[in-house]
A protein has these predicted regions:
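Active-site beta-loop-alpha junctions enriched in small/polar residues
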Residues: 17-19, 53, 90-92, 120-122, ...
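Internal, glycine-rich beta/alpha segment that forms the wall or movable "lid"
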Residues: 2-10, 56, 60-62, 87, ...
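Non-catalytic positions within long, well-ordered alpha-helices that form the structural scaffold/packing
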Residues: 41, 108, 272-276
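A structural motif
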Residues: 42-45, 112, 201, 279
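N-terminal beta1-alpha1-beta2 module of alpha/beta enzyme domains
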Residues: 1-79, 182, 285-290, 294, ...
Length: 316
């Protein structure tokens, strides 16, 4: 039976790769993602996240195709029972906003209320060009998309006509178990996007940081945006993405390793630093990149829970 993890100051998520070569140089198949999701449940992870990319094409590098994330999330929802599932993050420009809200509501139903909708404006222009999407005015398009997606998910209806998108007398029916409370994360770093976080999001995804200090460094802009919009920063959950590599005694870290790494005790101590700077949900790219990394990480989760329990017992 899957064990429900204890209440945590900072929840932990894992983000398996969907791109070619993303699993120790191999292309992940659905059976691999399914096995990793089920292993993550057993290990005590709180959430599992899948990316929303179509194609990676960088200069002087082999191009990498990606599986479609929402299709995989639907399948993962059917073979898991406890772990939360999310998009990290869905590019609103890849889909009609009203349809994206419908997809999120459907995933809410399939997962029995475990889905989290992570949203972003997209960034990798080559995949836009390859698949025929417009790359211009991404922030403006994103803002209009939110004006459709958020009312649909919250109130179940919207009537909107903008420069880029419209949804006239649109209703979202039937409704899933979250009943208008499906969590919405927004990934953002620039001032204009941060203002959209304050207006529409339940959680701010501060994107990727190798160390906790990276989160601390971006907080002033976040607080300024909150003040400008008039929202209490405490009402927005702080989330981040990072990297963790777990090695066994006698093993060495990869030469190009980034983020926090070492044996389980070192990784646990390093990750705890994210909780100390206010992160309440940390999404990780874990090395090794297959089920081995998840199984090794189970010990890290045990250590983090022990640290939290010990801290809670200390006087004062």
């Amino acid at each position: 039976m899957t064990q429900t993890p204890p209440a945590r100051r900072m929840r932990l998520g894992i983000a398996p790769a969907l791109e070619e070569g993303g699993m120790k140089g191999k292309t992940p198949r659905f059976k691999d993602i399914q096995a990793m999701a089920q292993a993550a449940e057993r290990a005590g992870f709180d959430s599992l996240w899948l990316e929303d990319h179509l194609l990676f094409r960088f200069p002087n590098q082999p191009e990498q195709g990606c599986w479609e994330g929402f299709t995989f999330l639907s399948a993962v929802a059917a073979v898991t029972t406890r772990i939360a599932l999310g998009s990290f993050v869905a590019a609103t420009s890849f889909r009609n906003p009203a349809l994206l809200a419908k997809m999120a509501e459907s995933l809410d139903e399939i997962s029995d209320g475990r889905f989290i909708l992570g949203l972003g404006a997209g960034w990798h222009e080559p995949e836009y060009t390859a698949f025929g999407y417009l790359f211009d005015h991404r922030a403006a398009r994103f803002e209009e998309a939110l004006q459709i997606i958020v009312p649909l998910l919250r109130e179940g209806q919207v009537d909107f006509a903008g420069q880029y998108y419209s949804a006239r007398e649109c209703v979202l029916r039937p409704r899933g178990p979250s009943q208008g409370q499906l969590p919405i994360w927004i990934g953002a770093s620039k001032p204009r996007m941060l203002r959209l976080v304050e207006r529409y999001a339940d959680a701010w995804n501060t994107v990727w940081h190798r160390q906790p200090q990276g989160v601390r460094d971006v907080m002033p802009e976040f607080l300024a945006a909150c003040q400008e919009v008039g929202r209490d920063p405490a009402s927005i959950e702080l989330t981040a993405g990072s990297f963790a590599e777990i090695v066994l005694p006698g093993e060495q870290r990869k030469p190009d390793a980034k983020g926090i790494g070492g044996q389980a005790e070192e990784v646990a101590a390093g990750l705890r630093g994210f909780a100390d700077v206010g992160v309440r949900h940390l999404v990780l790219l874990v090395e090794p990149e297959d089920i081995t990394g998840i199984e090794r990480f189970a010990r890290v989760i045990e250590l983090l829970d022990e640290m939290e329990a010990s801290a809670g017992q200390q006087p004062g």
